[in-house]
Amino acid sequence: MKNILKISISVALLSFGLNLSAAEDYSKLDVKKECDVKTNGVEKVIQTAEKYNKIAIEHGVEFMRFGMKNSQYIDASKEAIKSGAKEIELLDEKAKPTGEKVSIEFATWRACSFAISALTQEAQANK
């Protein structure tokens, strides 16, 4: 019984330490490097955006710009990649098209930079 307790405490402390160190890594992320569409390609950048936006949502810090959540930028970019479209249409706070369009590269870069910026700003605020 004591061994189970020791193992449980060890696992809990290790998990806490890993989570704490992972949070510190967010402040060191380089948006320009991670979100460079020309260097990394649209698909890789959108995967990066998805990865970090998922964490931002879990932390409750997802970016929103002009009523459009970052997850909507990601979804629209993924849909455009699938369909081969060159542009996505921006949405308002009611998820209705605004009539304004942006290139897939810009939308992907924006989604990635918003996802990472949400986490870096959160990490800086917690210091």
Regions found by a protein language model. Give the residues of each.
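Long, charged/polar, soluble alpha-helical segments
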Residues: 21-127
